[in-house]
Amino acid sequence: MKLMVFDVGGTEIKYCVMDESLVREEAGSVPTPMSSQEEFFDVLCSLYEPHRGEAEGIAMCLPGFIDSENGRCLGGGALRYNQGRDVAGPLSERTGVPVHIANDGKCAALAELRDGALRGCRNASVYIIGTGVGGGLVINGEILNGSHFTAGEFSFMRLTNTDWRDPGTTVGMVCSTTGLLDLNRRFVDSSTDPLITGRQFFEKVNAGDGMSLKILRRFCKQVAMQIANLTILLDLEKVAVGGGISSQPILIETIRDCLDEIYSDPGPYFDPALPKTEIVRCRYGSEANLVGAYFNYVEAR
């Protein structure tokens, strides 16, 4: 079965045609429209049109609280124009093919559970480091949606109790690529070292730049603390780290090392019998959302 698959993010829409062997063809990306749902549908339809007759349906993952069964976006995430509105139905009417939608983090978790780093796990999670932090929980061998479709929304968790309203205390602002680059800006003189991208930051890390290595470790310590908290709460076997920067081996290595450090000297208020989870890289990396969206469509039929 060939499907048109969309991974809708806050900055870009990744797309491809995918078949049951998970081969991705005609892949590309375009900027995500930010003005209206109508413009959003226009872009999706224009991307689908060249594949009409080839792709028999549309599988899509997107940010927000997604009611997959009814094709509704209850919370729009970065795309506020989708909040509280139907997405699958109107898009299906315009394209004339079935449309299935799901949350992006849950799609990543499904991809890794069915055919990736979490295969065979009963209780596990993906931790997707991007503009924010995406999550998807596997509980008792199934993807956990939650009572209101909000399970795994790690970005909204707080790191301190100082000010709930301060976005700078959220996991999404601190433990994301956004947070990593913000940390770099705070510790590096911008007059001599201008704003850099994630790729440029890791070029410095891999070249052995001392300050960049310190910044990375500080960032990974925060991520490791959140993974430790999730493990204490849910008794997770594995946590698969994904997102664009997960392709950097030193990121995964440093998160593991920081988690080892936490468990080796946790302080007095900690039971040494508490298990430490295994940290792995998502098999599908930044493609996990696309693969999971395909699986979601097939399993929903």
How would you describe each model-predicted region?
Residues 71-84:
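A charged helix-plus-loop insertion that forms the helical arch/lid used to bind
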Residues 7, 59-63, 126-132:
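Short beta-strand segments
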Residues 119-174:
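Glycine-rich phosphate-binding loop of actin/hexokinase-like ATP-binding domains
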Residues 1-57, 66-70, 91-97, 114-120, ...:
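ATP-binding/phosphotransfer module of carbohydrate and carboxylate kinases, centering on a glycine-rich
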